[in-house]
Every structure is written in structure tokens, then in C-alpha cells.
A protein has these predicted regions:
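Feature marking well-ordered beta-strand scaffolds used for ligand recognition
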Residues: 1-337
Length: 337
């Protein structure tokens, strides 16, 4: 709960009738809970404002939960993944700078905590990916995380931002400066009690080398464009708004399955070579990896546009499947009756 910016954090234990039977109140006053995880007789809670306290809480007696210990470090964890009974993985952001009331978040941080001494948990390993502006689906969707202890494997999506000499900062504070988005895909990490290291990277955002087109709205009637599945679309009409000379193009295809489908200029600009397609070569929601899994010795990564198979041994590409265009309609095509 929060009153006038002074937040209070509580843990409550409920019985089967949803009645409160135990509680720990007023944890980390002025901070906010970012993540929580339960394992056996312990609960782990991360709060954050300026630094990141990791609380270890004993819930073996549901009526008398108690804080066993806590660790204060820079950064925060949006997601906690249990490694084993004495170790926890935190996935979140590193932080630096700021003042006594806040810190600037930086790149994605992955840390391994040793909680075997519950009164004195320790951060034993960590890795920071990218600069301020780097992000990951794993911070808001736990299903985006692939972890396998036996294989020392951790895979998370990453949108990588990096700073350069032209990067602008706030009030000349370098910690406040955002990096430029330079890459998008999945980081494949080695993780064990001795290390967290990069094994390799996989992207679905392949570099485009085909033709580049003008804006679809500037194309004449009769112009054609080809979508990612090879279907040819033709501009057949320009619709004008009432009381305005501005109009938008209408495009159709003779491809099977699109008999009643009409796309406008914006849809066409997202086809290969279109102005939005080229502009979004680095940052593209459609090609952003959202899930990963493995079978035998093959790692599969999944985005809206494709499924890619890579060897778990050396991450070499084995195969890929392009998803049909009808699976990619996120741009509001107009459907006629």
C-alpha cells in the first residue's frame, strides 16, 4: 500500500478459507515489491527504490512468518527463478547513480544468490547485458524464461541497447543516458554455481537485403508489393476521407485464403522492403523472440514470424520455418463481408 509516496510492503498468509492467519508487515518502507517466489518453507521477496533488498522469509509456521535475513545490492529483480534449495536466480535491471531517493536503471541484470545462510544471503555471480534501454520479455512474462539446471542453460529474450559518443544524457549525467537499440533476439547463457556467461545469441531479425520501396501511399494504382509468404498484392483503389483531399490506398491479392481481405497503405508498408519494415529492422515486435524450448539437443526459439532450430552444442542454425502471413496480422487489415 502507498500513502503520499510512503509505500508499505506486507506479506500475508491465508488459510483455505482465505482468512489471514499470519503476516509480516512494514517491509522496506518507502520501497515497492518487484518480485516474490516461494519454495518449501521459505519465501523470497525483492523490493526496490534506490537499492535492491532481497528478503528471505521463514513461512514454516504459517501463523508466525518471520524475516530470516536480507541482502542489499544495486539493481532489482523483476523475476526470481529457483536454482536449487540454496540458490535463487534474479532477472531484472542493474541501477547506478541518481540520488538518495532513486537510481537510474541500466541494462538487464542476471544474478545468482546464495541463500544457504538465510541470515546473510549473498550475491555470488552476476552478468549485466547492455546499457540503459536494454529490455527483456522475461521481466514481465515468466514464460519467456527457459531454464534447465542439468544443462546449465538459461535463455531469455533481449532487446539490446548500447551507448555511443553521441548518446544524450539528462543534466550531463551519463547514468541517465539511454543507449541506442542495436540488436534483438535471445541470449543463451551458461549458468552454474561458478559462472554466468554468454554462450551465444540467436535472432529472428534477419538483415534485409532486398529491394526498398517508397511509402505505399505514394504508389500509383496498379503498383504491386509481395508479402513475406510470396503473395502479390496490388493497389486497386484510393479511398478519400470526407471534406479532405487526403486518401488511403486499398490493396488486394488473388492468393488463396485472402478472398475477402483488403489491406491499406499502412499494412503494405510493413511488407518486406516497405518503409516500416526497413525502419523496424532492429526493433520489430513481430520478430521479437517470445518463447524458447529444447528437445533432445535442439533449441527452438519462437516469434510471431518464425520458429528457428539451433544446435544446443554450438548454437549453429539447423533449420527454420517461416510462419504464414495470416499468423502475422497485427496491423489492422480491413476485412470485407
Amino acid at each position: 500500500e502507498s500513502w503520499n509516496g510512503n509505500s508499505l510492503n506486507h506479506l500475508y498468509v491465508l488459510d483455505k478459507d482465505l482468512k489471514i492467519i499470519g503476516k509480516v508487515e512494514d517491509l522496506a518502507k518507502g520501497e515497492t515489491i518487484y518480485s516474490a517466489r516461494f519454495m518449501g518453507d521459505r519465501a523470497y521477496i525483492v523490493t526496490f527504490k534506490k537499492i535492491d533488498p532481497l528478503f528471505v522469509i521463514d513461512v514454516s509456521n504459517p501463523r508466525e512468518p518471520a524475516v530470516l535475513g536480507y541482502l542489499k545490492i544495486s539493481g532489482y529483480s523483476d523475476y526470481l527463478q529457483l536454482y536449487d534449495e540454496n540458490h535463487v536466480i534474479g532477472i531484472g535491471k542493474e541501477t547506478r547513480g541518481g540520488d538518495e531517493n532513486f537510481a537510474w536503471y541500466q541494462g538487464v541484470k542476471i544474478a545468482l544468490f546464495d541463500v544457504s545462510d538465510v541470515e546473510n544471503p549473498v550475491e555470488v555471480r552476476k552478468i549485466e547485458i547492455g546499457d540503459r534501454g536494454t529490455d527483456s520479455e522475461a521481466l514481465s512474462d515468466h514464460k519467456a524464461v527457459l531454464f534447465d539446471k542439468a544443462r546449465n542453460l538459461l535463455v531469455i529474450p533481449i532487446s539490446l541497447a548500447e551507448k555511443n559518443n553521441q548518446t544524450q544524457s539528462w543534466n550531463n549525467d551519463p547514468d541517465s543516458a539511454y543507449g541506442t537499440l542495436v540488436w534483438q533476439g535471445a541470449y543463451v547463457l551458461n549458468i552454474n554455481l561458478d559462472e554466468i556467461s554468454l554462450k551465444g545469441k540467436i535472432t529472428h531479425n534477419e538483415k534485409y537485403t532486398g529491394p526498398v520501396y517508397i511509402a505505399a501511399k505514394d504508389e500509383p494504382i496498379g503498383a504491386t508489393r509481395t508479402d513475406s509468404s510470396g503473395n502479390v498484392w496490388t493497389k486497386f483503389n484510393i479511398m478519400h476521407y470526407d471534406y479532405s483531399s487526403y486518401g488511403y490506398g486499398q490493396w488486394k491479392t488473388s492468393a488463396s485464403g485472402y478472398e475477402n481481405t483488403i489491406f491499406d497503405d499502412y499494412n503494405i508498408d510493413n511488407f518486406p522492403g516497405g518503409i516500416n519494415y526497413v525502419r523496424n529492422q532492429v526493433s520489430n515486435y513481430q520478430t521479437q523472440i517470445k518463447r524458447s524450448l529444447y528437445m533432445d539437443n535442439v533449441l527452438y526459439t519462437i516469434s510471431n514470424t518464425k520458429i528457428k532450430a539451433n544446435s544446443l552444442s554450438d548454437l549453429s542454425e539447423l533449420n527454420k520455418v517461416e510462419l504464414p502471413a495470416e499468423q502475422q496480422r497485427y496491423y489492422g487489415g480491413v476485412f470485407a463481408e
